[in-house]
Regions:
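Beta-strand elements of well-folded, non-transmembrane domains
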Residues: 39-41, 53-57, 92, 117, ...
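Sequence termini and other peripheral, non-core segments
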Residues: 1-15, 117, 123, 131-135, ...
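Acidic/polar low-complexity flexible segments
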Residues: 68-71, 77-86, 92-105, 197-241
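Order/disorder boundary and secretion-linked terminal/linker segments
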Residues: 1-67, 227-241
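Charged, amphipathic alpha-helical segments
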Residues: 47-75, 181-195
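Domain-length accessory/inserted modules outside core catalytic folds
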Residues: 4-6, 24-26, 164, 168, ...
Length: 241
């Protein structure tokens, strides 16, 4: 099963953002982003995340900082949120026992991925805790190795959009600049058709994106608090995978 999210831009500073980028506010509102979350078997279970982005005009696309894919860049890297960044937050009950659940019920995982292949996974005990930067990496349960992501080769090229729901329905839709990245993360199968990343059950999910246009960052999510804060779990969605 798959679940698709349509992301919208945070509007708190959008007028000022448009002025800094040198475009109309409406042009920024017409940036289209969809993220699909899907449980796939290959042969082990993975959570697959596909990010599909359309920018309404070539002139705006020329201002987008979208780093080119580089195989040599694949690996863990901190502070990706300071650039164009594909993100996802995951939370849920823990897969161990009731004592652990009571202690860590507010814990959650943050996934960061750069279009060029860099990535990072972090674990928080509660809202933005620990507060030190960079956050603590997410390790496998043996604590010997960081958890990584697996990039999908066929999504690594810029291409024309095929999903016209993200673009204008004019005859020029095929010329709209578009970008796609897809990666997956290893999951554990649990009873009652539940899935876990490390020992955190995937119950709530919050895919989001930061797009950097020159020096201006725009924030995209299915829903926003004001000011935008991806860590606020009250705006996360129930996972239906």
């Amino acid at each position: 099963m798959s679940q698709t999210f349509t992301l919208c831009v945070a509007t708190d500073t959008l007028v000022n953002d448009a002025q800094q980028i040198g475009v109309a506010v409406d042009e920024l509102r017409r940036i289209g982003i969809q993220v699909t979350a899907e449980i796939v078997q290959r042969p082990t279970l993975h959570l697959q995340l596909t990010y599909y982005i359309t920018v309404p005009t070539p002139s705006l696309a020329a201002k987008l900082n979208w780093p080119a894919w580089q195989t040599k860049q694949i690996g863990f890297s901190d502070y990706l949120w300071e650039e164009t960044c594909l993100e996802c937050f995951i939370t849920g009950s823990l897969a161990k026992n009731e004592v652990d659940y009571a202690k860590n019920a507010e814990s959650y995982i943050e996934i960061n991925a750069s279009p060029d292949g860099r990535y990072a996974l972090y674990r928080f005990e509660s809202y933005r805790n620990p507060s030190t930067l960079p956050p603590d990496p997410l390790y496998h349960m043996d604590r010997h190795e960081r958890i990584g992501i697996y990039w999908e080769d066929k999504s690594l090229q810029q291409r024309s959009p095929v999903d016209t729901s993200l673009s204008t329905k004019s005859s020029l839709a095929s010329t709209i600049p578009s970008y796609e990245r897809r990666f997956s993360i290893l999951l554990n199968q649990l009873p009652k058709q539940q899935y876990a990343l490390n020992n955190t059950v995937v119950e709530y999910i919050h895919p989001c994106v930061i797009l950097k246009f020159n020096k201006t960052a725009l924030y995209f999510a299915p829903r926003h608090v004001s000011p935008p804060d991806f860590h606020n779990r009250h705006y996360w969605s129930k996972f239906k995978g």
